[in-house]
């Protein structure tokens, strides 16, 4: 929900076969109320202790074409990619001291710095980094010395004002300029005075571009409530001369009060919160030309409440692409605009769907071309790649990947442009692999695709990669059900070359069966000489003696669906256990993956060690299973999801180890909505529920998300009514604990308060309620331990 899920770090992700699990000695689980009685050392505090998280390497990118930077035992090293030999650069303590001293001597200011920040390398051993409002230049070719005139770290320039005033920042590609948003207005700061006459004449090294920000006008920040893949609002051109930026006018949007309780009396702090069916904000895109000091806004036309996303500059910096989406979210146009005039040049692609469209990625340009690009699209029902090759200013569109699997990320092209690297679910929806595709030769057929596809990743599981096209090397972070974290350095160039001449070793056999490899594709896989392990985390919870985990796949309502079970370490299949169902169930989330975290968490092990089975199922509506799986919930959020969860409940109750009279359910956000729905719309099915931050009435939720899945309230009154939980408050059976953060600006507090009011009027509703003052949509920080103690105790007391 708004990309926020209730995933918690640190889990033991162990897949098991469907065979019966081994028995072990231990106390029998009571057929009555369960109480926390376990031999395991796992406590709730331990569930959130960093010592129980997989360890990670401290990598700082490529310091040269052949060496990457890494901190080990308090020292920054340059590590040779071929030999893994380390060359000491500087001690972390020395780096911190030199940096703080440089700032203090120049400005008199003290800054907080406790380690080496991420450094943007611009040359061999040279780069820059941020500390507060300061941009620091680093040159490790210089000797490590306290003499600031010759030291390796110096102040490059600073943002005027205090660092906390900057609402957003974005550096130009050459790192000589920075776009800054302060008090909702746009500024440009830097010492590259040759880029702008105004900047050269400013005296302060800063120029103000906009002046009407504030009071409902917002510049340069994320818009549309972060939907459509939007994560920022500032976009530099590749030539460092032009800056595109969002302008958002929220004056039509209703003010919504959040109350700060720390003042006396409490103070109302208003936010702009556009609820479904109400007036939305207006977004436009401006372009500022530094050299000519010219500001132009794109002529996007249409109604005021459209959506603009996927902002992409062409390589020659003459044009800007935008994915335009209508408010109904059933039509998308890929529009090309002239950066000088702001006029529309062409509409190069259109897509419509009777349910919804959701473009989240802009064009990826082919190396050496200012016109031809790749675009991700779900037009065939799965997220795949399409080549747009232009002739006479019109595109010829060719699909280059196909199959019942999804492209989940694109890493870019090899240096010679021959191969495209992309992340995908080809092996399994539970996994992520990175493949190299000979994209020019790829041919799509009725049954799939025929192409050279080389699996670059070293093992089954979740592989997250970053690729450096300049040196042909890729850093691959792997986790799976056996591996907390393992980091590989992969020679992509050699891996591709070797794979074309011989087959690699076969990867580990999966404990589940997947058959999504595209017909006709040549797949080469395997860990080999081109994979070097540069870091491996020990198992942080090996000594805790935790129980096993099992993943199943069943056909549910026409689709394969995955479920996961945590068992107690002393599990006895001949005894009866209470079950806690953990649910999310909403779009843009996948609870079950082949990874160490995998959507589970240590709290689930904690509950298992205290005598409960913990079950999770990814129902229709969740992600990475194709468009039909996700949009099955359209206009009826909650209905199909409940049907799938009830099928899972029936399966649970058919297991001889399940105490069918003692099944509880818990979830947060969309999971809180699901928990409340199942406790009230199917009363008596679950004995106990804990619902956190729940949507209660979809007409009170934000426009962008709600109208995509439900349309407007006046267009779909039946759907809104059927899934409005206020109409079911009097049907509640069993015990339900509802929890909310008082400052929640995603699912506003009003949702659960309205439900409390209905429950009180129902008189017989068994509703318990708890509020976390000062917390937003998730309870974070030290209070999270308190939250999970409360959730656990509720199940101990009533399930």
Annotate the PLM regions.
Residues 1-9:
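Bacterial N-terminal signal peptides that target proteins for export
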Residues 10-12, 21-467, 472-473, 483, ...:
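Beta-propeller folds
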Residues 47, 255, 317, 446, ...:
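Serine-hydrolase catalytic core recognition
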Residues 5, 336-339, 491:
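Short alpha-helical "patches" and their helix-cap loops
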């Amino acid at each position: 929900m708004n990309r926020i899920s209730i995933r918690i770090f640190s889990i033991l992700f162990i897949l098991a076969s469907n065979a019966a699990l081994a028995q072990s000695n231990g106390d029998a689980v009571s057929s009555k109320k369960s109480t926390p009685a376990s031999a395991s050392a796992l406590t709730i505090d331990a569930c959130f202790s960093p010592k129980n998280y997989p360890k990670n390497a401290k990598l700082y990118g490529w310091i040269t074409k052949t060496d990457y930077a890494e901190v080990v035992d308090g020292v920054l090293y340059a590590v040779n990619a071929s030999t893994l030999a380390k060359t000491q650069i500087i001690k972390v303590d020395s780096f911190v001291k030199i940096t703080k001293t440089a700032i203090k001597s120049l400005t008199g200011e003290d800054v907080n710095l406790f380690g080496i920040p991420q450094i943007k390398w611009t040359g061999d051993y040279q780069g820059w980094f941020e500390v507060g409002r300061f941009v620091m230049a680093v040159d490790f070719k210089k000797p490590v010395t306290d003499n600031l005139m010759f030291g390796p770290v110096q102040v490059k320039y600073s943002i005027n004002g205090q660092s906390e005033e900057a609402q957003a920042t974005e550096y130009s590609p050459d790192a000589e300029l920075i776009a800054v948003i302060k008090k909702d207005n746009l500024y440009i700061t830097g010492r590259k005075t040759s880029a702008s006459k105004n900047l050269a004449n400013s005296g302060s090294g800063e120029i103000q571009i906009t002046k009407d920000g504030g009071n409902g006008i917002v510049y340069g920040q994320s818009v549309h409530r972060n939907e459509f893949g939007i994560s920022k609002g500032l976009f530099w051109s590749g030539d460092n001369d032009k800056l595109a930026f969002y302008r958002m006018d929220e004056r039509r949007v209703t003010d919504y009060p959040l109350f700060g309780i720390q003042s006396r009396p409490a103070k109302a702090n208003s936010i702009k919160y556009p609820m479904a069916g109400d007036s939305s904000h207006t977004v436009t895109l401006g372009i500022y030309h530094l050299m000519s000091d010219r500001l132009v806004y794109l002529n996007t036309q249409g109604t005021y409440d459209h959506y603009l996303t996927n902002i992409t500059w062409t390589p020659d910096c003459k044009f800007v692409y935008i994915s335009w989406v209508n408010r109904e979210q059933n039509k998308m146009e890929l529009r090309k605009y002239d950066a000088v005039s702001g006029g529309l040049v062409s509409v190069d692609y259109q897509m419509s769907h009777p349910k919804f469209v959701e473009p989240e990625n802009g064009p990826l340009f082919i190396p050496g071309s200012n016109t031809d690009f790749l675009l991700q699209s779900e037009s065939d029902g799965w997220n795949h790649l399409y080549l747009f090759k232009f002739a006479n200013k019109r595109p010829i569109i060719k699909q280059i990947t196909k199959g019942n699997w999804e492209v989940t990320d694109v890493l870019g092209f090899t240096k010679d442009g021959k191969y495209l690297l992309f992340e995908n679910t080809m092996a399994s929806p539970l996994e992520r692999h990175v493949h190299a595709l000979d994209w020019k030769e790829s041919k799509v057929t009725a049954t799939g695709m025929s192409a050279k596809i080389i699996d670059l990743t070293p093992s089954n599981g979740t592989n997250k990669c970053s690729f450096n096209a300049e040196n042909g090397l890729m850093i691959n972070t792997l986790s799976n059900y056996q591996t907390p974290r393992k980091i590989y350095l992969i020679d992509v160039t050699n891996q591709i070359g070797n794979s074309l001449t011989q087959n690699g070793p076969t990867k580990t056999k999966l404990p589940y069966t997947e058959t999504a490899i595209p017909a006709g594709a040549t797949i080469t896989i395997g860990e080999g000489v081109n994979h070097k392990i540069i870091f491996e985390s020990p198992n942080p919870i090996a000594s805790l003696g935790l129980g096993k985990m099992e993943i199943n796949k069943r056909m549910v309502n026409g689709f394969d669906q995955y479920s996961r079970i945590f068992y107690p370490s002393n599990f006895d299949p001949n005894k009866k256990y209470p079950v806690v169902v953990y649910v999310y169930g909403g779009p843009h989330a996948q609870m079950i993956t082949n990874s160490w975290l995998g959507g589970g968490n240590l709290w689930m092990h904690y509950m298992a060690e205290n005598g409960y089975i913990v079950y999770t199922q990814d129902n229709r509506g969740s992600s990475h299973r194709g468009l039909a799986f996700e949009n099955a919930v359209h206009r009826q959020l909650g209905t199909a999801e409940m049907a799938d969860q009830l099928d899972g409940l029936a399966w649970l109750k058919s297991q001889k180890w399940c105490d069918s009279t003692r099944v509880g359910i818990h979830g947060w956000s969309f999971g809180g909505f699901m928990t409340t729905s199942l406790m009230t719309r199917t009363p008596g099915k679950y004995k106990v529920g804990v619902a956190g931050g729940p949507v209660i009435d979809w007409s009170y939720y934000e426009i962008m998300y709600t109208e995509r899945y439900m349309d407007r309230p006046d267009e779909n009154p039946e759907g809104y009514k059927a899934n409005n939980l206020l109409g079911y408050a009097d049907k509640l059976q069993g015990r339900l604990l509802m929890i909310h953060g008082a400052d929640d600006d995603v699912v506003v507090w009003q949702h659960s308060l309205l439900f409390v009011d209905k429950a009180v009027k129902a008189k017989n509703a068994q509703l318990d309620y708890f509020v976390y003052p000062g917390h937003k949509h998730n309870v974070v920080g030290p209070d999270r331990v308190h939250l999970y103690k409360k959730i656990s105790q509720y199940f101990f007391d009533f399930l």
